[in-house]
Amino acid sequence: MRGNPLIHLLAISFLCILSMVYSQLCPAPCACPWTPPQCPPGVPLVLDGCGCCRVCARRLGESCDHLHVCDPSQGLVCQPGAGPSGRGAVCLFEEDDGSCEVNGRRYLDGETFKPNCRVLCRCDDGGFTCLPLCSEDVRLPSWDCPRPRRIQVPGRCCPEWVCDQAVMQPAIQPSSAQGHQLSALVTPASADGPCPNWSTAWGPCSTTCGLGIATRVSNQNRFCQLEIQRRLCLSRPCLASRSHGSWNSAF
């Protein structure tokens, strides 16, 4: 079967162009230094893109080209257009599966895990979000326990409320000033009277990057009653591309 002569001519021309480009990028014969380069600890020696000389493999986030190849043992490939402002090539993971790494352990995208007994986390697109497992309830001062406080009980995960024995008061009728101060936290303030401020500190942001939600317990509302309040938070901007993030010091 005879082919089109024009197609044959184009194919031959294309092969000639490829051979010219290859000869410019990869000179023949190979010219390598007598001594191999000294690589940083943990960086292996690999053959360059021309298959001639041994070079230090490029690591995650480092620039790469036809000679300086990425570390194949780490699953890195040279991604064109991934450099600053979309220019140049950078070593990235071959398959960005959205997994995340916490305390040296890798979790799959969508997998839930407990870094400790106080929080439940979920791996989500290279980052992770966590929810508290310990109760955020608030114990108000009372006549028999005017100063409640949280303590860490041995053998228990979540802190518990106890009454400080050093300040325990006998079961007597409190003074009018003390009674007014304590009852103001329990009963709603009148429309004309001010609301005494009783608020906990804002909790951590629910996400490691991008917009998240932080919570606290406060009585700063129109009814002067304790409630869980929420607000938007931003820990840091998310990267444009997903990365295998590690947050070993988070817990």
Swiss-Prot record:
Pinpoint the VWFC domain residues: 98-164
Q: What is its main location?
A: secreted
Keyword Glycoprotein in annotation: yes
Q: Name one GO molecular function term.
A: growth factor activity
InterPro entries named among the record's database cross-references: CCN, Growth_fac_rcpt_cys_sf, IGFBP-like, Insulin_GF-bd_Cys-rich_CS, TSP1_CCN, TSP1_rpt, TSP1_rpt_sf, VWF_dom
Q: List the disulfide bonds.
A: C26-C50, C30-C52, C32-C53, C39-C56, C64-C78, C70-C100
| SMART domains, per the entry | IB, VWC
Q: Which UniProt keywords apply?
A: Cell adhesion, Disulfide bond, Glycoprotein, Secreted, Signal
Q: Glycosylated where?
A: N197
A GO cellular component annotation here is: extracellular space
Signal peptide coordinates: 1-23
The residue ranges of the TSP type-1 domain are 195-239
Q: Which PROSITE patterns match?
A: IGFBP_N_1, IGFBP_N_2, TSP1, VWFC_1, VWFC_2
Chain ranges of the IGFBP N-terminal domain: 24-103
Q: Where in the cell is it found?
A: Secreted
Q: Which domain of life is it from?
A: Eukaryota
Q: Does the keyword Disulfide bond apply?
A: yes
Any one Gene Ontology BP term? regulation of cell growth
As for family, the record states:
Belongs to the CCN family.
Q: What does this protein do?
A: May play an important role in modulating bone turnover. Promotes the adhesion of osteoblast cells and inhibits the binding of fibrinogen to integrin receptors. In addition, inhibits osteocalcin production.
Protein's UniProt name: CCN family member 5
